[in-house]
């Protein structure tokens, strides 16, 4: 087997490994339901803006976790268990609010326009962290970063997989209300 074939196999293997590991953990399909429920009061333009910001923030978080996640968590003394607990509490609260929301009579409520600074803050917390790229995604990304050998094809495959997952996040959140 020549070097090109080995690098190609390594690239594809790293892509498939990272993509199939991250996608079910992040689960943007169910995350889109929370997103639509919690942003129902926003205009379509604001919801689109928040979805784009969530994708961007998710990309940044996943890349930082890939390259430096284990160092950062150790530096601050944060365990994955603490992140997992906080993420669970936020998910529980969001689910509880969705279950106890007042019944809608079919008429649409007036849409609100919020300042961009408020939308950015909303996009980061709680949507990006911990709902989208929460403790599970952080732990998995740190594990991927420490498991795969550092070579160009593995790194390229993993980065492309993260980009693909972020694209799925954006698509699900952007068009989740349709």
Predicted regions and their residues:
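Transmembrane alpha-helical segments of integral membrane proteins
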Residues: 34-36, 166-178
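Generic transmembrane alpha-helix signature in multi-pass membrane proteins
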Residues: 17-23, 32-38, 125-130, 137-147
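Structural signature of hydrophobic alpha-helical transmembrane segments
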Residues: 14-31, 80-89, 156-169
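Small-residue-enriched transmembrane helix starts and helix-helix packing motifs
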Residues: 1-24, 101, 108-128
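Juxtamembrane transmembrane-helix termini in multi-pass membrane transport proteins
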Residues: 14-64
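Membrane helix-loop-helix hairpins that form the core translocation module of multi-pass transporters
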Residues: 48-102
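Membrane-interface helix termini and inter-helical loops of multi-pass transporters
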Residues: 2-7, 70-79, 141-154, 178
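Juxtamembrane helix-boundary/capping and inter-helix hinge elements in multi-pass membrane proteins
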Residues: 37-48, 81, 115-119, 146-152
């Amino acid at each position: 087997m020549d070097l090109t074939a080995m690098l190609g196999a390594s690239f594809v293997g790293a892509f498939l490994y990272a993509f199939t590991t991250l996608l079910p953990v992040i689960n943007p399909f169910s995350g889109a339901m929370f997103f639509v429920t919690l942003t129902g009061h926003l205009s379509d333009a604001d919801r689109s803006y928040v979805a784009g910001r969530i994708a961007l923030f998710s990309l940044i978080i996943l890349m930082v976790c890939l390259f430096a996640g284990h160092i950062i968590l150790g530096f601050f003394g944060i365990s994955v268990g603490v992140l997992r607990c906080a993420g669970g509490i936020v998910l529980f609260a969001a689910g509880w609010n969705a279950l106890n929301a007042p019944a809608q009579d079919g008429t649409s409520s007036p849409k609100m326009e919020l300042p961009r600074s408020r939308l950015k803050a909303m996009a980061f917390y709680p949507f990006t962290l911990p709902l989208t790229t929460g403790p599970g995604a952080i732990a998995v990304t740190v594990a991927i970063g420490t498991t795969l050998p550092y070579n160009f094809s593995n790194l390229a495959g993993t980065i492309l997989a993260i980009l693909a997952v972020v694209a799925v996040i954006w698509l699900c959140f952007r068009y989740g209300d349709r």
